[in-house]
Amino acid sequence: MLQQWLRQSPAAAGLLRCSRYRGPQAALLQLSPQRAPTYHAIRSLQTSAAESQERIPLRKQLKQGAKGLKAQKRQRRESEEASRQTWELTVGIEIHAQLNTETKLFSRASTSSTDTPNSNVALFDLAFPGSQPEFQAATLLPALRAAIALNCDIQPISRFDRKHYFYQDQPAGYQITQYYEPFARNGYIDLFKHDGIAPEDGDHVRIGIKQVQLEQDTAKSQEYPPSTQLLDFNRVSHPLIEIITMPQIHTPATAAACVRKIQSVLQSCSAVTTGMELGGLRADVNVSIRRRDEAPGTHQYGGIGGLGQRTEIKNLSSFKAVEDAIIAEKNRQIAVLESGGVIEGETRGWTIGSTETRKLRGKEGEVDYRYMPDPDLPPLYIGEDLVSGLRQALPTPPDELIELLAGSDYGLPIEDAKPLIELDDGARLEYYQDVVEILRSLQQDQDAKSRTILARVAGNWVLHEFGGLWTKADLAWDAHRVPPQTLAQIIDQLQRKRITGATAKQVLVMIFDGDRRSLPQLLEEENLLLRPLSREEYIALAETAMSQNPQMVEQIRSKNQLGKLGWFVGQMMRMGEKGRVEAQKADEILRELILGQSGSQP
């Protein structure tokens, strides 16, 4: 390598020459006579044979890496299991969700998040002296929908309080909330295995909801290090609900599942417009630890006693962050207690990708915030007729929809039913149901089993084939791009074996990309209709494929290695005219010729 470098660099070659070579460890470089001779030992530029032999192929490196990760996961599971036997984790969650409203909570300013910073601001939002709050009654409706969907008791009378603290994102020096008398209490949310709860929690967990309260959001801060911070007051006084769960969660995975499920419920009843992924929902988690073999702790929350000292981790913005932050804080508290330390009640932060929480400040209590009734706002009265009307107008809850889709009428696996419900605020589910209804009308005289099969086929196309095109194009969902009628017709043609699966996918892509020809016209003009092969043509293809590998034919005959039939089917499909060879019929002919099994003749 040195010689090559010297050849490519004549100037360097003129300055340097090797005085003499004594092996890799004694290589010396000497300056030319024009300069004073100075000698420096340098590292060998050669690669020894032993080093070259140690190079590991990439595939082997990947395998070793995968094994290492698997071993780490196994060790982590074993460590967590041992930890669970000794320590009890308790978690409570506070979820802050931006409501789906056009105006702010106490002013008529718009809640649009896309406008120019500081353009949607009323005098009260900036706490101008003399400005007064004007409660916007319309903001109550999505809050009520959320509380009803979370099985809460709506309170006929609720009141607003001031929570005092000073920070730059809250110009009034206090936040208006409902600390003492919230508008909703005593709710619950049910979590099931398919929601992602931890295996040790069984098949079902019910988490109590202590209360749901209305409150203001704060300004949006943007930091520009080292010393600049900009504030956008468009978000000040945006209506929020704070959902406070009971401390009844005992595993990190179930905590994340709880936040995910609550977001799904809020979206299903149009209480919110965005979720965690766009900043419309944030979570704070309260974490405490106690030894199982010791007396119950001295702390209590929400009427549940015997808890350890809790810490709060603020502003978690993803489901994974919820789970990871709880794991990190649990491990920190266990380490502190095992070393003889004491857990301090404090507020902590979490950074994505970190393995540790960090202290932000000491934990404030009720006295620190100086809660007091807001003298500028009257009590909030909620009539039973309003609650009853909203309850009747709510859409079907997600759990009931999953039960419907996984039932005998649709027969979808739960892993397909869940995304259909959650994607595109229910628009994907509505599209799917339209496709199924049209497809069933096209495929008349179907028995119950056949109707279920059609629904499952349609689910695969809507969620995976059609859904994959949207994911690849990175576009917002639009049902008009491929209307339900068109997709149902494509599936109908496939079910009637007038087109192949490959052709069906090709046609779907063409229509998705903007081809506006009717389906019959497109199939005819592009020569995509399946022209079935005769029995003789299938036999000719099969015999040709068999002649190419008689040894494999004998293995199928003598050793009953039926899995190798697939190779011959593939050969027949490659040899035949594109799209004309049907795999099922090819398999039937091969079984007849090789094994003497008679099937339905094509």
Curated annotation (Swiss-Prot):
Its EC number is 6.3.5.-. One of its GO terms (biological process) is glutaminyl-tRNAGln biosynthesis via transamidation. Allows the formation of correctly charged Gln-tRNA(Gln) through the transamidation of misacylated Glu-tRNA(Gln) in the mitochondria. The reaction takes place in the presence of glutamine and ATP through an activated gamma-phospho-Glu-tRNA(Gln). Residues 1-52 form a transit peptide. One of its GO terms (cellular component) is glutamyl-tRNA(Gln) amidotransferase complex. Subunit of the heterotrimeric GatCAB amidotransferase (AdT) complex, composed of A, B and C subunits. It catalyses: L-glutamyl-tRNA(Gln) + L-glutamine + ATP + H2O = L-glutaminyl-tRNA(Gln) + L-glutamate + ADP + phosphate + H(+). It is found in: Mitochondrion. Keywords: ATP-binding, Ligase, Mitochondrion, Nucleotide-binding, Protein biosynthesis, Transit peptide. Belongs to the GatB/GatE family. GatB subfamily. PROSITE patterns: GATB. Residues 61-83 are annotated as: Disordered. Its main location: mitochondrion. This is Glutamyl-tRNA(Gln) amidotransferase subunit B, mitochondrial.
